[in-house]
C-alpha cells in the first residue's frame, strides 16, 4: 500500500480538533462516556502518528518530509503548509504520547467534563500543528490557539489562586506573541516578494542589523514559553495552580514549543544573527541552571519546587542550542524529549500525592512512604531520572550537551571552562534538592494530624500504568540513545553546518582549509 501521498499531518492535526467539536452532542450524564471517547480519539491519533512516521518517514533524509501545501490566500503566498523533519518529528510523537496519557490522568475530573475534554482534544491538534506548520502566519495562529485552552484549564480547574495564575499566563504569552506577529510580518514583506513560507523566508538576504532585530523579537517571545529567566515567573504560578493533566501538558509539551521555535526560527532562518546572540544564550542557559536550581532548593511548595526544577533543566537546551556542535544540538533536542517525559511523570505524581494528602507544603508531609509504597517507588524512580542518573534519558541528554559545548571551537577555552564548571555545579545541586524533597515527603516521622484526617491509600492501577508508560521510554533512551537520536541526527547535523558557517572565525578557518587543500600537491601521482 502506497501511503506517501496520503495527507498524514493534516489528518493528524484535524482529527482531534474535529472530534472535540462532537463532544457537545454526545449523550452523557456523568462524564464517563466523554472520557472514554476522548481517550479513544487520543489513541487513534497517536496510532496514526506512529504509523505515518514508520511507513513514510526516512531518518536519513534531513529535509522536510510528509509535506503538504494547499493554497489559502495566493495573493500573499499564504498556504496550509505542513511538513516534518528531524526537529519536529520527535516532538510530534511526544505530543501524541503525553496528551493521550494526560487524558487518562484526567479520569477523576468531574467538574464540567465536556468542556475539559473538549479543551484537551483541541490542544492536541493545536500542539501538533505548532511542530508541523511551515507557514509563519499559520504558525502564529496555531501558537495563539494554545493560549485559550491553557487559560481555561487553569482558570476553571485550578487551585485557589487560579484566576491570578491564568491571567498572568495569558498576559505573558499573549504579550510575547505580539513579537512573533511583528517579526513575521516584517520578514514576509521584506524584499521584492511577499511570502510567509518558512523555506522562502530562510532564503531572503537580510541585512545583519535587520537580522539582529528580528532575532531579538523572536527570542523574547520564545524565551517566555521556554522559559528563560527573567521571563519565567508565570510558570511557577501556573504549575502551582494546575491540575495533573494540565501539569503534564505544560511540562511535557508547552515548554518544548519555545525550544523548538528557537531552533526552527532563530537558528534556521536567521543563522548570522544567531552567531552574535549565541554567547548571550549560553550565559542565560547557565543562569537558568544555577538560579532555578537554587530557587527550587528553597521552595517549600512541592509544585513550585518541581516547576523551578523544570526551568533549570531547560537551561541545558539553551546551551546545547548555542554550542555550534552536532553533539550539543543533538543533546538539546534529546533534552527536550527527555524532560517532556520526566516532567510529565513528576507532575503527575505530585498531583497523585496531593489528591491523597490535600497539601503541597513539605512541612506538612513526612513519613507517608510506609502508607503509599507504590507512589514512593514511582516518585523515587522519576526523581532519579530528573537528577540524571546513568541509565536514564536525562543523563544521556545532559552529557551530550556537556561534551558538545566543551568541544566547541566557537568559544574561547576560558569561557568554556567557566561555563562547564557552572553547569557541573547545577548538576550537583539537582540531587540535593530532589533527594531532600523525597526525604521530607516519604521519610521521617508521620504527621499525625495529616494521617488522622486523610485516607492515604496507595496508587491505583491507572496511576501505575501512566508512570510505567513514561518510564519505559525514559529508561529505553537512557540505555540506547540511538533509539531517538537516529530520528533527528541528519537534520541537526545539517543545521549545525549552516550555523558554523555563520560564525566569522569558523567560516574563515573553513575557507583556509579549502584554500590549502586546493593548492596542495597531489601525493602519489
From Swiss-Prot:
Its EC number is 7.1.1.-. Keywords: Membrane, NAD, NADP, Plastoquinone, Quinone, Thylakoid, Translocase, Transmembrane, Transmembrane helix. GO terms for cellular component: plasma membrane-derived thylakoid membrane. It catalyses: a plastoquinone + NADH + (n+1) H(+)(in) = a plastoquinol + NAD(+) + n H(+)(out); a plastoquinone + NADPH + (n+1) H(+)(in) = a plastoquinol + NADP(+) + n H(+)(out). It is an enzyme of class 7 (translocase). The chain crosses the membrane at residues 6-26, 36-56, 91-111, 115-135, 137-157, 169-189, 212-232, 243-263, 277-297, 314-334, 335-355, 375-397, 417-437, 464-484. Its main location: membrane. It is a multi-pass membrane protein. It comes from the Bacteria. It holds the Pfam family Proton_antipo_M. Coiled coil: none annotated. InterPro entries: NADH_Q_OxRdtase_chain4 (IPR022997), NADH_Q_OxRdtase_chainM/4 (IPR010227), NADH_UbQ_OxRdtase (IPR003918), ND/Mrp_TM (IPR001750). It is found in: Cellular thylakoid membrane. GO terms for biological process: ATP synthesis coupled electron transport; electron transport coupled proton transport. GO terms for molecular function: NADH dehydrogenase (ubiquinone) activity; ubiquinone binding. Belongs to the complex I subunit 4 family. NDH-1 shuttles electrons from NAD(P)H, via FMN and iron-sulfur (Fe-S) centers, to quinones in the respiratory chain. The immediate electron acceptor for the enzyme in this species is believed to be plastoquinone. Couples the redox reaction to proton translocation (for every two electrons transferred, four hydrogen ions are translocated across the cytoplasmic membrane), and thus conserves the redox energy in a proton gradient. This is NAD(P)H-quinone oxidoreductase chain 4-2. It comes from Nostoc sp. (strain PCC 7120 / SAG 25.82 / UTEX 2576).
